[in-house]
């Protein structure tokens, strides 16, 4: 492959950066970088009613967070209508397009009749071969492509193979609306040509659009980019991905505590593989990525795998980076003291073992916040309410007399208390853990005790 490869990511700014769109952007980015090419960004904002500035910013921030930095200036379709209009008029002048004056109501009537008769609807305009002397003066026309009435179009797809569509199944699509604005089909083709796009990688829901776009490419005499239509992401149940499956925006995954490196790795493995490799960091992905290793079957979103992968990436971070990320979350609602930061740092490895996301990590780190009351989970509250108060008094008395308060000494004392009360160690630790951490599952209580110290531990063992 030459270094002239140019790919593009072309979202419509009508909402958040969807997880499926993020994967499309990732594949385009990796293919471009693998071939020393360019990855371009185009905002398809011709739908003025649905496009929002907030959605544009969400796309920008989502891509930047994932590390998918684009080359060159962002292209906004809303600023290029003069270019589209000029292109449509060119086809009109060459006899490859025509003015159509048929009212939309009439077209809808024909569509409904075809539906009632269970027929495939293709609009055939009576204006296709009319001359200007027959044009009505009181109706603003649209400009339609004069699609060849015979022959076929072949989509040469690197993944789907050759897909042949007969021209008789392609209508004379509108290129320019009656208000002078371009349609999606025209804008995409003009932009891809103008931007020098060599490869189009997108979801296979665009496969039906491909034939119509190729018809426009052919009318202009443009070179058709190499196309790859990838299967969409499905939910764990095999159904089309929706919000109930977790079809959220990239920003939501960030807020849920996923790392961008982890999410990119996970999305890469959704529909692409490199042997049995699971952990693939960005530099390795750029080196390995190719279109030949794309899968033909829809990939399924699996949060268990996503969480497992994220926990791996958490453990790859250095201590200072982890502390910084934990504090970013905790400091939203609480000012963490230097002493508490030191506690968290000392207990970090114990927290990591039980964490899959940054939110898990931050939640567990609250164990080491000594200047606020312990936040008790409902199960912990129930355990405390039903615990043997005399047993807790024995624990307090045993810990008070300890001269050394390291984890070994604390553990030995708990073993003695358990034996003295004819209990198993975990029977003693269950209410103690609930009181000290507010949780039913936590890192080692013995380690927590050593880190927090006798005074803080005894304070937490006071049953209110």
UniProtKB/Swiss-Prot annotation:
Motif 'HIGH' region, chain ranges: 11-21
SUPFAM superfamilies to which the protein is assigned, alphabetical: An anticodon-binding domain of class I aminoacyl-tRNA synthetases (SSF48163), Nucleotidylyl transferase (SSF52374)
UniProt-annotated location(s): Cytoplasm
InterPro entries found in the cross-reference section: aa-tRNA-synth_I_cd-bd, aa-tRNA-synth_I_codon-bd_sub2, aa_tRNA-synth_I_cd-bd_sf, Glu-tRNA-ligase_bac/mito, Glu/Gln-tRNA-synth, Glu/Gln-tRNA-synth_Ib_cat-dom, GluQ/Sye, GluRS_core
Single Gene Ontology MF annotation: zinc ion binding
Superkingdom of origin: Bacteria
EC number: 6.1.1.17
Keyword field: Aminoacyl-tRNA synthetase, ATP-binding, Cytoplasm, Ligase, Nucleotide-binding, Protein biosynthesis
A GO cellular component entry from the record: cytosol
Disulfide bonds: none
Reaction(s) the record says it catalyses: tRNA(Glu) + L-glutamate + ATP = L-glutamyl-tRNA(Glu) + AMP + diphosphate
Positions contributing to ATP binding: 243
Motif 'KMSKS' region: chain residues: 240-244
Signal peptide: none
BP GO annotations: glutamyl-tRNA aminoacylation
Coiled-coil portions: none
Stated family: Belongs to the class-I aminoacyl-tRNA synthetase family. Glutamate--tRNA ligase type 1 subfamily.
Function: Catalyzes the attachment of glutamate to tRNA(Glu) in a two-step reaction: glutamate is first activated by ATP to form Glu-AMP and then transferred to the acceptor end of tRNA(Glu).
Protein's name according to its UniProt entry: Glutamate--tRNA ligase 2
